[in-house]
């Protein structure tokens, strides 16, 4: 008898190692993207707040111009990403941009509506952070979860589960507690604070509604067409820069003619602009590599960091027990909204 030959397990082991390596890389990318999201969200809010309240000689930078520059930087970043997807070939890049943007004018025009709304939202965030401390802004801005959910139900016919509806109720209660007036201030300071807080709150609320509508509208466009998210962001940035420039000349034309487009710009201003430009790209990466629960964790961590830094560094915020209670409710609602209960498996029959 001839000895039987054993089949080698090397191909199987090699395939298993390759799969494990791929899973490890995916996990690393997931947590890397979430870490970047926490850093970007927290640092943008804090630096924007600091830049709008910092007392300096000369004119303050125009927030409307910062929005335009952020849109232009976003276009540049997305073009570089399309270039990477085109295997770093300029001819391929040129063909892709020509075919997907210039040759499809009606598809490109679809982005005009969400782009205009996003431009309004970005300007409102500067107004909000000029009148609210970073911690209060961060917590209140989570109302965009509510508006996004409602627009998803009405525009995309999305069905929400019991946990999601419950989370929206908890979210509204949490934001109400966060906005609860404090009795610790003097009457004069309290009156001034109430006025500016009302302006900031209105700016955040309008930004939440605009964010919810534009986000769902953009999602609908992405689902109905096959264009890449980077191409769509280039189209958004194109219209955003046009609408932004219109806003600059309509609302800040007089100051612009006196002191120029880049009046009041310094290193901190450029940090704010770059962070704002990268925001959409970071969100896209998180959507690709992470899930809603981890995104909720990142948002919660960002709120906590903003609260601590506002108290210890900016010193423009004194947390109360009511604020903490409201913040805990908002964080819990964020987790609950992303919670996806898995149905119990069928019992094994004997």
Over which residues does each language-model region extend?
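Polytopic endomembrane small-metabolite transporters, centered on the Drug/Metabolite Transporter
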Residues: 1-350
């Amino acid at each position: 008898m001839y000895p039987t030959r054993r089949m080698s397990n090397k191909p199987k082991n090699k395939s298993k190692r390759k799969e494990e390596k791929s899973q490890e890389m995916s996990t690393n990318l997931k947590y890397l993207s979430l870490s970047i999201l926490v850093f970007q969200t927290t640092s943008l809010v804090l630096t924007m707040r600091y830049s709008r309240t910092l007392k300096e000689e000369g004119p303050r930078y125009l927030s409307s111009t910062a929005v335009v520059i952020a849109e232009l930087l976003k276009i540049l970043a997305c073009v570089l990403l399309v270039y990477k997807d085109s295997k770093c070939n300029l001819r391929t890049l040129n063909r892709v941009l020509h075919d997907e943007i210039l040759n499809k004018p009606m598809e490109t025009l679809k982005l005009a509506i969400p782009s205009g709304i996003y431009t309004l939202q970005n300007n409102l965030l500067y107004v909000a952070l000029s009148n609210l401390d970073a911690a209060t802004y961060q917590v209140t801005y989570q109302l965009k979860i509510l508006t996004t959910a409602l627009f998803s139900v009405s525009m995309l016919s999305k069905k929400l589960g019991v946990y999601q509806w419950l989370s929206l109720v908890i979210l509204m209660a949490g934001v109400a507690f966060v906005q609860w007036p404090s009795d610790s201030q003097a009457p004069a300071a309290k009156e001034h604070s109430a006025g500016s807080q009302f302006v900031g709150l209105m700016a955040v609320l309008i930004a939440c509604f605009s964010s919810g509508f534009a986000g769902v509208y953009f999602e609908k466009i992405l689902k109905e067409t096959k264009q890449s998210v980077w191409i769509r962001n280039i189209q958004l940035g194109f219209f955003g820069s046009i609408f932004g420039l219109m806003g600059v000349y309509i609302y800040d034309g007089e100051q612009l003619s006196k002191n120029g487009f880049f009046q009041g710009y310094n290193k901190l201003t450029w940090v704010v602009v770059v962070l704002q430009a990268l925001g959409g790209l970071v969100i896209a990466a998180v959507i690709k590599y992470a899930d809603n629960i981890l995104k909720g964790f990142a948002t919660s961590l960002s709120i906590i960091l903003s609260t601590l830094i506002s108290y210890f560094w900016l010193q423009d915020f004194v947390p109360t027990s009511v604020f903490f209670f409201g913040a805990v409710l908002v964080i819990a609602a964020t987790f609950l909204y992303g919670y996806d209960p898995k149905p119990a498996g069928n019992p094994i029959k004997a």
